[in-house]
């Protein structure tokens, strides 16, 4: 076979092809290093003897549709200059890998647009071979995110499996990179992050998180000088949960069958942003439901008013709006609203801190959506470390892996 084909297509530069044969549908190239190119693997001397050889097989990039192997005759070298007795270097493969570097690069190229399952089928190798190549690449490029430049971070959780199995992630809000992945969603989930952060803790200026008491306690303990910010996303999300809880309670209490039907069919309209309901029929349906039930109407309009806390021109005006909202919720005597008011009052300082730093968890919620897609792409994950590395590389748009 032409030497340039071996060099350019297969990534083999020092060896010559001695023979070509087929094993079923598979193509096998028999290669070896010419005598004049053999040298000591330690000192590079050509003052050597060959003390035997053996055949080592490598998976190479396919030629056409044929799975291709390289059977290389690897010589044992005895050097007269340095005295070593070792096998010759195989520069087209890494260490004891059974595939060539060119094959690994092809796997990584395919990983930009194909799943592990697709790649393993196309290249006729096992799922684990593809996963291990990806993992080696991820470990060398993403295993130790730089924490020294962190200034503003966000903390959140996501479910790894159905049920209550969670992981905690920390995101650099200035570049959108995941910099830490912790097991579970409690206070201890961040222990590894604090340990890795070390003296760089003093550089953290602000932390955005949800209404989790575990996270707020952990941040207050380890980052006493950082501002803690609770953004509108999680407050609004909690308010929507309270509104839906009230809707279900009212549905169970309502005796009139027709009114029950009206309440049951309005969940989507109640939870949606009122300014986004443009359909005239939907608007009439919502107003009809609210007119039939005063507690539901109060809760709905308080939900709509809640976002005004983040629409003020100053922190002082936002404080006044927040205090007035809490007052109205308490005076309503509606239990879910009173609980919501209690929560907002408890997190008042953190909510208003948004006006000092203007950070939200919007970035991290977008990342959570990417994580859902990632889990589908890899058909679940069989290796915790591999999954974490995939998360660390999630921001790199040039990679599908």
Label each residue range with its predicted role.
Residues 47, 126, 137-141, 211, ...:
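The DNA-recognition helices of helix-turn-helix-type DNA-binding domains
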Residues 57-164, 201-204, 217, 351-352:
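Short, positively charged, Gly/Tyr-enriched micro-motifs
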Residues 96-99, 178-200:
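Active-site beta-loop-alpha junctions of metal-dependent nucleic acid enzymes
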């Amino acid at each position: 076979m032409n030497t340039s084909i071996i060099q350019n297509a297969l990534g083999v530069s020092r060896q010559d092809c001695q023979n070509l044969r087929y094993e079923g549908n598979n193509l096998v190239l028999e290669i070896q290093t010419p005598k004049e190119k053999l040298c000591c693997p330690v000192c590079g001397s050509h003052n050597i003897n060959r003390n035997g050889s053996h055949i080592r097989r490598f998976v190479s990039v396919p030629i056409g549709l044929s799975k291709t192997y390289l059977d290389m005759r690897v010589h044992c070298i005895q050097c007269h200059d340095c005295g070593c007795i070792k096998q010759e270097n195989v520069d087209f493969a890494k260490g004891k890998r059974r595939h060539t570097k060119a094959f690994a690069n092809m796997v990584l190229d395919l990983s930009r647009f194909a799943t592990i399952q697709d790649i393993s089928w196309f290249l006729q190798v096992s799922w684990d071979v593809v996963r291990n190549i990806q993992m080696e690449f991820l470990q060398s490029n993403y295993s130790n995110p730089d924490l020294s430049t962190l200034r503003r971070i966000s903390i959140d959780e996501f479910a790894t499996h159905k049920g209550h199995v969670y992981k905690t992630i920390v995101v650099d809000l200035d570049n959108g990179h995941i910099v830490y992945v912790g097991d579970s969603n409690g206070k201890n989930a961040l222990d590894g992050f604090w340990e890795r952060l070390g003296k760089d803790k003093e550089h953290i200026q602000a932390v955005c998180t949800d209404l989790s008491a575990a996270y707020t306690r952990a941040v207050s303990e380890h980052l006493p000088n950082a501002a803690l910010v609770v953004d509108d996303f999680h407050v609004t999300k909690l308010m929507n949960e309270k509104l839906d809880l009230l809707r279900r309670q009212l549905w169970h209490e309502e005796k009139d069958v027709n009114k029950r039907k009206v309440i049951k069919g309005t969940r989507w309209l109640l939870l949606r942003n009122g300014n986004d309901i443009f359909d005239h029929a939907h608007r009439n349906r919502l107003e009809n439901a609210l007119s039939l039930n005063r507690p539901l109407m109060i809760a709905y309009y308080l939900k709509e008013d809640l976002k005004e806390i983040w629409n003020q021109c100053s922190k002082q005006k936002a404080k006044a709006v927040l205090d007035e909202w809490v007052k109205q919720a308490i005076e309503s005597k509606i239990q879910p609203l009173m609980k919501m008011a209690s929560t907002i009052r408890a997190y008042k300082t953190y909510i208003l801190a948004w006006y000092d730093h203007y950070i939200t968890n919007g970035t991290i919620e977008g990342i959570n959506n990417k994580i859902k897609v990632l889990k589908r792409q890899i058909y679940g994950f069989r290796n915790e470390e591999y999954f974490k590395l995939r998360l660390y590389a999630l921001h790199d748009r040039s990679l599908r892996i």
